[in-house]
């Protein structure tokens, strides 16, 4: 059965068959591509369409889409050993990502799930690399471009518009957007080096990168994900050292997500859905961004859960590394490691509690 049909059917069965105390919170479905040595998921939309990349036996990366019909390779510019990554997908099935042959500058690409064999190049005439990070439901793309990186917004009407840096007078400063929502709010970061990184905010139509304010301007901080209401999550430090998963307030202050580092010292929140459920990673070492860590977690109903311990099956995985996206239905996608230490990916479908048990009846 195709992956997404299976997940949908499973969720329906779960309503009748799950779950009193001790029952797993999620059902695991591996994301696979025949012949792939590794699979790295990047995003899921509310329709359940999923994007990412897979590696073939020759170590070439391919941009890929999964939907109810199975998996589909996304077209890339011609060339030898062109590597592709699909980074984000919106509710309309528009996808953004990159291609790179390590000869030409990195191309930012826009695909449509309905026509995976065609693409639009987002680069302008500057010859600079373009790295999209997100696309909203209006088809507005945000990310970073150039070297050092500068924030940009792309629209079908205006093309690529440079949003610049937070402070152009600072030597070697770089900036990029990490997320954009339907209202046009932008979040991201500026940095000079690993130890000097700060969350930023912007709005589509005003080409500027602005510090988020408050503690985000004085402490290390990085805004990573955002929901439709504009609630941003990411990682930040209260001591200029340890970066932990946080939720940002509009004034730039932030609150640590209790328990989200699990048994690690650090971590990052990566995504938040409109219900306020947050997912991320724990154990990121010295990284200043949401790199794959040692554990993956979900924060729901005031509790952080180690996802590896609340799924019904971990076959094919020795551990989870991160949870990178969550849709409106609470379906989570993320990555882990197999027995050979290759990156593999999963879909976690919520197991809903049966009301007959929720009200206290126990046969």
Question: Model-found features: residue ranges?
Answer:
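Bacterial N-terminal signal peptides that target proteins for export
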Residues: 1-8
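Residue-level hotspots at or immediately adjacent to binding/recognition sites across diverse folds
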Residues: 21-355, 361
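N-terminal signal peptide c-region/cleavage motif recognized by signal peptidases
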Residues: 16-18
């Amino acid at each position: 059965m195709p992956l997404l049909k299976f997940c949908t059917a499973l969720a329906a069965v779960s309503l009748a068959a799950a779950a009193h105390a001790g029952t797993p919170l999620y059902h695991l479905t591996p994301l696979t591509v025949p012949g792939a040595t590794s699979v790295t998921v990047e995003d899921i939309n509310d329709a359940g369409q999923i994007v990412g990349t897979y590696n073939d036996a020759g170590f070439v990366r391919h941009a890929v889409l999964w939907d109810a019909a199975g998996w589909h390779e996304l077209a890339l510019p011609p060339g030898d050993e062109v590597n592709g990554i699909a980074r984000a997908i919106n509710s309309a099935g528009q996808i953004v990502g990159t291609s790179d042959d390590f000869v030409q500058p990195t191309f930012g690409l826009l695909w449509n799930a309905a026509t995976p064999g065609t693409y639009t190049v987002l680069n302008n005439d500057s010859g600079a690399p373009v790295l999209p990070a997100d696309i909203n439901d209006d088809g507005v793309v945000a990310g970073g471009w150039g070297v050092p990186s500068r924030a940009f917004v792309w629209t079908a009407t205006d093309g690529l518009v440079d949003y610049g840096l937070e402070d152009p007078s600072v030597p070697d400063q770089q900036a990029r957007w990490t997320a954009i929502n339907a209202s046009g709010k932008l979040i991201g970061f500026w940095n000079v080096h690993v130890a000097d990184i700060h969350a930023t905010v912007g709005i589509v139509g005003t080409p500027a990168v602005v510090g988020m304010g408050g503690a985000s301007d004085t402490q290390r901080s990085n805004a990573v994900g955002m929901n439709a209401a504009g609630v941003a999550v990411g990682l930040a430090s209260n001591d200029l050292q340890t970066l932990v998963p946080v939720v940002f307030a509009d004034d730039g202050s932030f609150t640590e997500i209790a328990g989200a580092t699990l048994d690690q010292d650090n971590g990052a929140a990566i995504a938040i859905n409109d219900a306020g459920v947050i997912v991320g990673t724990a154990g990121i070492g010295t990284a200043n961004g949401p790199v794959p860590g040692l554990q993956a977690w979900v924060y729901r109903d005031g509790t952080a859960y180690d996802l590896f311990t609340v799924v019904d099956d971990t076959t094919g995985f020795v551990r989870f590394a991160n949870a990178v996206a969550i849709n409106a239905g609470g379906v989570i996608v993320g990555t882990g490691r197999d027995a050979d230490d290759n990156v593999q990916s999963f879909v976690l479908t919520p197991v809903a509690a049966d009301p007959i048990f929720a009200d206290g009846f126990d046969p």
